[in-house]
């Protein structure tokens, strides 16, 4: 590749884009993080639906699993996490469409992926031994949820490098203060 030339009109951003490829790539990561958050919401939805169906059909000690208070509590927590992440993802997507929300895209990815892990774990618990069997969809949802935390920036990298840094920068900005009049 030594001596390989590239004309300016082939460079992203033309001549103004020289040396900025990394920044162009990083700007594209926000969309990828939103897509990953959306995938996490899809996994949560599928796990919740499968759990509701299984809880209706599965009988334990003569009654449907759905009639046990602990099952209802698990399903309620699963639904709450799914709903919250879905609504947040929609809200942040609108902000991104308007040109903002870089840190927020990382936040929603963090929250949705972690929530997908929790929701699919609860789905596995509700399905018992059947949930762990590789041929069941719930087992696949659990595996899919785990890998989502790695896509588009590992959880720890996002938390430290993107979210914490953005929060720290915002906290350290001097607050705007009204100008003092000459008499005070």
PLM feature spans:
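C-terminal helix-coil-helix/basic helical segment that borders enzyme active sites and/or dimer interfaces
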Residues: 52, 56-63, 79-111, 124-129
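Short, conserved micro-motifs enriched in small and acidic residues
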Residues: 31-38, 102-106, 110, 153-157
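Glycine-rich beta->alpha junctions and the first turn(s) of the following alpha-helix
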Residues: 1-83, 148, 170-184
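Hydrophobic, well-ordered secondary-structure elements that form the walls
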Residues: 44, 75, 85, 112, ...
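Alpha-helical scaffold segments that form or flank carboxylate-/histidine-based iron centers
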Residues: 66-78, 102-111, 139, 144
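Glycine-rich phosphate/cofactor-binding loops in nucleotide/flavin-utilizing enzymes
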Residues: 27, 127-184
């Amino acid at each position: 590749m030594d001596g390989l030339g590239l004309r300016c009109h082939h460079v992203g951003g033309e001549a103004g884009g020289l040396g900025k490829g990394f920044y162009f790539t990083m700007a594209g990561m926000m969309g990828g993080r939103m897509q990953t958050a959306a995938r996490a919401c899809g996994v949560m939805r599928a796990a919740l639906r499968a759990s509701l169906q299984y809880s209706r059909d599965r009988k334990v000690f003569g009654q449907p699993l759905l009639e046990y208070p602990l099952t209802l509590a698990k399903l309620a927590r699963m639904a709450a996490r799914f709903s919250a992440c879905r609504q947040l993802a929609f809200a942040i997507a609108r902000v991104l469409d308007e040109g903002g929300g870089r840190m927020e895209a990382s936040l929603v990815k963090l929250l949705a992926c972690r929530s997908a892990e929790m929701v699919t774990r609860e789905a596995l618990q509700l399905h018992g031994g059947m949930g762990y069997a590789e041929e069941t969809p719930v087992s696949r949802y659990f595996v899919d949820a785990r890998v989502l935390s790695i896509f588009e920036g590992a959880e720890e990298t996002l938390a430290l490098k993107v979210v914490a840094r953005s929060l720290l920068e915002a906290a350290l900005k001097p607050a705007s203060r009204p100008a003092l009049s000459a008499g005070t």
